[in-house]
Amino acid sequence: MAEQISMIGTVILMMVVDFKKMAVEFRKFFELDSTQNFPALNIAEKKLCQADAQFEFNIIADADWYYKDSIQAYYKHRSNCHEIGIKESVYQKARNGDHSALYSIAHEISHWGLINYFKLSTGIPESEQIDPITKVVFIKIHENIADLLTSLLVFSEEELLQAKGAGDLDLSSFMSKDQLSLAHFYCQNHKTLKENFMKKLVSHITAQKNNSELQRRIS
């Protein structure tokens, strides 16, 4: 159930948030244009430290890594510390140009950007008393939009559509099938989603105004 609810929440955000525009703006923040590769490791090691006095980039020895093996990096947001941590072996892979390792770092940079740059946080503070299912839903939504922003930072819309469509472009070394499916859904439907949302919003506002006018006349 949490998975279904979080996907509905993600689609609603797709209706009201222009993630393509966000990706362009975030690239400009790092002085990158649309033709340049996204230098995830350089940004994490240098640029974020310059941009955010509370940012830390930490390399964790494999022996001290307390997350499951499938997690290559993490982002932690605290009041006095904004941290990206990465497993040492994954860091070495990133230095050698490994696609999956670099994409994982880019994903954590997206988390930093959503919370600190765009102020778009769907996370739950640890001190907040909330039921477990709701907490999982919020976490999943935040992961989904971080996945989406990352895909748009690293690839063009055309590349994402080609990878899912004709299969001419293989992005499996960068992202999972679920991440690619989410990016493809957005690229294929974001205009329609936004148009439908605006139509429904205008229709709802008009109906409310008409109802208010009717109530005024009756009274």
Which role fits each region the language model picked out?
Residues M1-S219:
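Active-site hotspot residues in diverse enzymes, especially metal/ion-binding acidic/histidine motifs
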